């Protein structure tokens, strides 16, 4: 988190760091907007509007892939604009996985692991995150696209919200700053502390999701930062 690194953790920073500190002071830090439900289910869901015969002919298991349940583009934009108001779409965007389909070692032969990620679920949700009422609503929304019985198949479940990401993983406002640029941004090097991992402060290097190549490419940022340090 470059914000905390430069604005909170540095004590008596050298004059050489003034420019980068001023830059990050002017850079907004957004709040988290992702929540994740993990559940143990006793029966696999069956989608209502999927032609199973089509997948069987091609040897594909539709439950092995990530299912994206997305509202319209206009609604997605609306969901983004609702974040500052602490509101959530009636039909939030959902990402659904059953990891135990791909990894049978995660199941006891009768139960499966079910994962549902909901987007545009703000840290500052106006109803608060102390209740499971809102996450339960996402499960109900998912249940609308599968055959009856899904809710009854849920044996145990938990939800990790942006509030949990802050308290359990120390992410300010439940948000992990992620590098928003791509390879071109790295080549242009307009933010060397993020793309080259070096800072104006001797001995201080950055790594993590905020640095190139960003979240989702596990370990790449740390490896690049380590190479940079060892090359000194």
Residue ranges of predicted features:
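Mid-domain catalytic core of redox enzymes
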Residues: 1-107
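C-terminal structured subdomain/cap of oxidoreductase catalytic cores
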Residues: 1-47, 109-113, 120, 130-141, ...
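Flavin-binding catalytic cores
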Residues: 44-45, 60, 73-91, 128-169
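A glycine-rich dinucleotide-binding beta-alpha-beta segment and adjacent secondary-structure elements
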Residues: 86-99, 148-212
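A glycine- and small-residue-enriched flexible loop/hinge segment at structural boundaries
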Residues: 118-125
């Amino acid at each position: 988190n470059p914000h905390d690194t430069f604005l909170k953790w540095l004590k008596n920073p050298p004059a050489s760091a003034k420019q980068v500190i001023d830059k990050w002071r002017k850079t907004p830090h957004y709040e988290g907007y992702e929540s994740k439900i993990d559940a143990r289910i006793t029966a696999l869901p069956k989608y209502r509007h999927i032609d199973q015969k089509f997948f069987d002919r091609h040897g594909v298991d539709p439950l092995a892939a990530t299912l994206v349940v997305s509202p319209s583009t206009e609604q997605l934009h609306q969901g983004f604009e609702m974040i500052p108001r602490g509101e959530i779409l009636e039909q939030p965007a959902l990402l659904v996985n059953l990891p135990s389909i791909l990894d049978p070692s995660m199941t006891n032969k009768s139960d499966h692991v079910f994962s549902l990620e909901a987007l545009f679920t703000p840290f500052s949700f106006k109803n608060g995150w102390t209740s499971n009422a809102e996450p339960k609503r996402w499960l109900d929304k998912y249940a609308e696209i599968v055959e009856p019985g899904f809710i009854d198949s849920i044996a145990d479940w938990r939800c990790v919200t942006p509030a949990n990401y802050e308290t359990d993983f120390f992410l300010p406002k439940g948000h992990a700053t992620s590098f928003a640029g791509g390879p071109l941004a790295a080549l242009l090097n307009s933010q060397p502390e993020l793309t080259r991992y070096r800072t104006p402060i001797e001995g201080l290097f950055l790594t993590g999701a905020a640095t190139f190549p960003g979240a989702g490419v596990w370990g790449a940022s740390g490896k690049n930062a380590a190479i940079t340090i060892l090359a000194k």
